Amino acid sequence: MKLTRAQHASLYGPTVGDKVRLADTDLLLEIEKDYTVYGDECKFGGGKVLRDGMGQSAVYTRDEGVLDLIITNATIIDYTGIVKADIGIKDGHIVGIGKGGNPDIMDGVESHMIVGASTEAIAGEGLIVTAGGIDAHIHFISPQQIDVAIASGITTMLGGGTGPATGTKATTCTPGKWNIERMLEAADAFPVNLGFLGKGNASTPAPLREQIEAGAIGLKLHEDWGTTPAAIRTCLSVADRMDVQVAIHTDTLNEAGFVEDTIKAIGDRVIHTYHTEGAGGGHAPDIMKVAGLPNVLPSSTNPTRPFTVNTIDEHLDMLMVCHHLDPNVPEDVAFADSRIRPETIAAEDILQDLGVISMISSDSQAMGRVGEVIIRTWQTADKMKKQRGALAEDQGKGNDNVRIKRYVSKYTINPAITHGIDDYVGSVEVGKLADLVLWDPRFFGVKPELILKGGLIAYSQMGDPNASIPTPQPVFSRPMFGSFGRARGTTSITFLSKAAMDLGVHEALGLQKKIAHVKNCRSISKRSMKYNDATPNIEIDPETYEVKVDGEMITCKPFEEVALAQRYFLF
């Protein structure tokens, strides 16, 4: 029996050479490799393959390699490749990406990918699977952010705060041992991976060390607490000794020094620069030049992604609120005006597309939207495809695979590497926590179908619970069983520093979630960033704000209409 490509795709999803459009964007993926076996595909349903003695083994037990969950015939988008495969999950982790089923009657089934009586199935045919997103710039202002974030496909949130305190509304810091311990206790209640940054603004080491020993996974330097060269040097020295990351929001007003002074204080040590363009804060007008340095891991926040006709006006109002400024004080208004520059925001689009800026995050409720990291990432990718055409690496191939890998890396693997958690999350790879997001291609980047947390469904598009089937309206993202009870603790991780784990902080606090410590935070560089490791020379004119990359001026026009927008949000 032979199937046409169209018939095969409708039954089992696309295969090598098939192309899929991502929602209403101009981005096309092409399957690079198919790990399934033609004619022996797994498929669940009445009269289908995954039945006893057929695609499901009648004899193998869980201890003999039977999976807890198989996602069949999934299209995977990951920095590692764009492939078609079955995904095998056991004990909450990915154990196989390849061919699952019954090895007694099917070709190519791997010994760790056996489907048996212990196996649940998710039909991945025609769906796209990505790693759960990582938002590495969270102001923990309200716990309700977590519901919005996970519903959008974010499964790991890193940042700081203690709730709607004035300091947290402006800065991403959980300051001091007592506050860190309380936030670690609160983390048990949520079905996402969490990690907290301490306050890095101190010019002596002891106040910084005690926060890392209390459980902080890193330190945040913020201008509202005084990001002076002395504080920068001290913070990085402590981080180097204790193997944690430092995130920085530099001195917009250039009070304690200019961007050159900050670069000198950083030296050759690795650092994560938040909202590197500068609208979210940082040396005006030229903080973005740090994005070209080999030891700087730069990120954007999502309100400037992508550059549109509304970006500038929105930012001025946001800034006044977030940084506790008074519109009646001329100096406060001047502070706000100095940060919002159309020229550098336009250049930020290009730098994202060139792989110079390596990450995208939210800046949640503090000049950023927690549920829009993923959607704005893909809006930026689409805007750049429309304005700049295919990347050089994609020229002549008829697909956008390199661009797609570049952009998915910005909110998955790269923040994981930056903050020392890439052994656990950040990609669709064997051994990692099964934090996976399943998308209907028509809604890719906008509304996930399923969000798996540690191998269990935590959120899903779900219809009326009183209906006779799951699909009747109203259909929207709702919490599932992985979001409740003790399941949250076995399917999610609270990240600590190694110092805190060695001191037994998790045991002293009685934390219920899985615990893991960050590592290799200080041995990385820009070269560690997947598909986003470019280090060109960046210059910003101090009067016109024009941006040059390796001597060539870069800019783009703002869009009046973007993809993934109003047609998806009619209700």
Swiss-Prot record:
| Membrane-crossing residue ranges in chain numbering | none
Cofactor binding remark? Binds 2 nickel ions per subunit.
Which cofactors go with this protein?
Ni cation
Q: Does the keyword Cytoplasm apply?
A: yes
Alphabetical list of PANTHER family matching this protein: UREASE (PTHR43440:SF1)
Q: Which family does it belong to?
A: Belongs to the metallo-dependent hydrolases superfamily. Urease alpha subunit family.
- What is the recorded name of this protein? Urease subunit alpha
Q: Which organism is it from?
A: Halalkalibacterium halodurans (strain ATCC BAA-125 / DSM 18197 / FERM 7344 / JCM 9153 / C-125)
